[in-house]
Curated annotation (Swiss-Prot), chains A, B:
Record protein name field: tRNA(Ile)-lysidine synthase
UniProt xrefs under PANTHER family: TRNA(ILE)-LYSIDINE SYNTHASE-RELATED
Compartments reported by the entry: Cytoplasm
Record-listed E.C. numbers: 6.3.4.19
Positions of ATP binding: 13-18
Organism of origin: Solibacter usitatus (strain Ellin6076)
């Protein structure tokens, strides 16, 4: 949890757990201790008195004392308080003011957390409960002790602590579990329930650690971050066992929206089902995300919108496609230079147009429903939408799909290339060469 | 769950769930249905009436009816009843009397099971709850419906059912969950608790399916079945992530004792710790198993005992080592035959003795504490115990370790070979060649 000589800041509320922790760490010795306290100012004079109590305790022990006063945002007071404290502790660590922040959570807290999450339904991740050590540097040395043992320690040594009035109030879910449900379940079902739930957490924590490694590996293989979205090939998801697929989808959701807040079993399930459905389209919602299936792809992200554009392209030059990081480059090449441009280049996907056949009023715009033209190699005109279907282009890629027109005629579009009537050939004198580039 | 035309036997207790199931399957059509009923005879006339009710129902529907009367063993009546029913259903499947046995378990049963197991503390395996389909052929078509939906179905169709008196009794854990705890938790914590717990089960079931495959693969690699025991190399266990190591240990315990009854988190944990401890020895208990560490090995099995033996070995011939499937073969080879026995053979692990140097009173016995001799290559006499240490021979292998004596002298022992003073050499006329063989 900490090396000898480490600078350990102890979060002390003034309650039994954290007061015990502070005394125990002083007794242990060999650490550079300091005391942190957060005053939420929620209970007025009482809050003030807690802060003074902790300040005096630190002073008596000759330890540096750091008080943070916070004003809580609206919403769940219990949750907001917890977040404000964690934010403060993480700041202290990030600022290098200490090597570790030690908190007084006990096995009783662990059991309460696991029970609460079980009732809310939160898979193994939730059952893993409170972590004894976090990557950020928070440690919880009392996590294997029960609250009764803590109070015994304090009474034996006649160490005073403050009863937090909020700890008794039934309005907090935590207190209803602590004083109501947990003792009831222990009495009626399992006298060792606190220990049992701590084991459940420990088991789940190891499982989660295993999965984190597995899913890191798989997401590097199978998830692609796009513009404001994450893409998954449905085939790679279908190849996985259901448990792994579910976890990979959770990871994709987390990547796409930054967290997993509000995401439940049903959301994940519907995404997995969308990937396995035989039809290559469909849609489902995850809080904060739009999930679309198109052919072999799933897209998780903010809903994509069509941003119409109509530009005079630079010749020569590169014109950025609005709403994307791609640009269309246009270049004029004279006949005399054809030695560096073999004829077969005319048949590449990007293609070349015969400059003489163009009237010169070029427009670069996005694909529109109903667009049609005759690409080289086809015997007649075809709707671009049909070409999209044939080439399995996902719907979200179509929105900004570039089309080059000359007057009324489509002379080129991405992927399907030059129009048969405008394509450059051996007889062309001046060639307009098209390319697509990524703009950083 | 079942193919069209399948022969489906429906387990009907007479209660709402199973009566609903039977009607629903009749409605569904396309199946060859029959009705199974188990009478535990627990509630005398009432049990009888249940059986008659179900029999009459089957008759009215024109379905074959099979009644099994059982007498329950001592112990937990609820558990014994469940086991007796399952035994009967498995018999029916094994005998080929039906393709599937359909049971009336609902999502409400699922939630009760998950909650009960959570309170008892049973990792993901327990949280997986009731399986909708088992490998043996039991199916539970109502597993996604709640009990209220079942009763609605029956009331709408005015179908009567029997209220099982045992379902109301508070003496059964199941009933205390059904009528007490689950409604309380739903009211106080999560109105959708039954659904939440069903999802927990579904999630856990997929995880377990994944793990079953992983652990099958790993146990084929890392577990060795020995005489009444299972062996694991500690190195292969230490190389695994904790979650995987725990699951592999559970598998090893299951292999060694046939089931996992009575095995809890702490047992598994102590075995994993025994494997990771830096000292190469130690011991822990798992219900029904003795777990020993010796050097790089863990042995899980019935405690090994030393079975003393002292035999006149057959010359020539093979003598079985008592308590093992190994035998020591002794063979006499004349000088004239040395052409087929090159000299370097004398120096193999098994070795050869010079027949002339032996007084002839050979004894084959197990190693005794204090035994010592001078193997070839050592400059003096050495305790065999020291040689065991040097060669890292696990303690359980030492118990029946064979030693060959001639009068007072040890002339040979397994692995360490002939004694320097008795080993055959180029000058030997007649050679006693030793070998060890497996006896099937």
């Amino acid at each position: 949890m900490f090396a000898s000589g480490a600078r350990v800041a102890v979060g002390v509320s003034g309650g039994a757990d954290s007061v015990c922790l502070l005394h125990a760490l002083v007794e242990l010795g060999g650490l550079k201790l300091s005391v942190l306290h957060v005053d939420h100012g929620l209970r007025g004079a009482e809050s003030r008195a807690d802060a003074e109590f902790v300040g005096e305790l630190a002073a008596r022990m000759g330890l540096p004392f750091c008080l943070r006063e916070v004003t809580l945002g609206p919403g769940n007071v219990e949750q907001e308080g917890r977040r404000a404290r964690l934010r403060f502790f993480h700041e202290q660590l990030a600022a290098g003011n200490c090597d570790r922040v030690a908190l007084g959570h006990t096995r009783s807290d662990q059991a309460e957390t696991v029970l609460f999450r079980f009732l809310r339904g939160s898979g193994t991740a939730g059952l893993a409960g409170i972590r004894p050590v976090t990557a950020e540097g928070i440690v919880r040395p009392l996590i294997e002790l029960e609250r009764a043992e803590i109070e015994e320690y304090l009474r034996e040594r006649q160490i005073p602590w403050r009863e937090d009035a909020t700890n008794a109030g039934e309005e907090f879910a935590r207190n209803r579990i602590r004083h109501g449900l947990l003792p009831q379940l222990a009495a009626e079902w399992n006298p060792a329930l606190v220990e049992t739930l701590a084991h459940t957490a420990e088991f789940a924590r190891a499982e989660e650690a295993y999965w984190a490694g597995e899913i890191d590996r798989l997401s590097a293989e199978s998830l692609t971050a796009g513009d404001g979205c994450v893409l998954i090939r449905t085939e790679s998801l279908k190849a996985l066992s259901l448990a792994v697929a579910r976890r990979l989808v959770r990871r994709a959701i987390q990547m796409a929206k930054g967290d997993l807040r509000g995401v439940d079993f049903g959301h994940v399930e519907r995404v997995v089902e969308l990937a396995s459905a035989p039809t290559g389209r469909g849609r489902t919602q995850v809080p904060g995300l739009d999930v679309r299936r198109s052919f072999e792809w799933l897209r998780l992200g903010v809903p994509f919108t069509r941003k119409p554009y109509s530009l005079k392209p630079l010749v020569p030059g590169t014109t950025q496609i609005p709403g994307t990081r791609n640009g269309i480059s246009l270049e004029l090449i004279e006949k005399s230079e054809t030695s560096v441009l073999p004829w077969n280049v005319y048949n590449t996907e990007m293609g070349c147009l015969d400059w003489k056949r163009l009237a010169g009023s070029l427009e670069l715009r996005n694909w529109r429903f109903g667009d049609q033209y005759q690409p080289m190699g086809l015997t007649g005109s075809e709707k671009i939408k049909t070409l999209f279907q044939l080439q399995r282009i996902p719907v979200w890629e179509r929105a900004q799909w570039p089309v080059l027109t000359d007057g009324e005629s489509i002379v080129w579009t991405r992927r399907f290339g030059p129009a048969a009537g405008f394509a450059a050939g051996p007889e062309s004198g001046v060639v307009l060469k098209l390319g697509e580039v990524t703009i950083r």
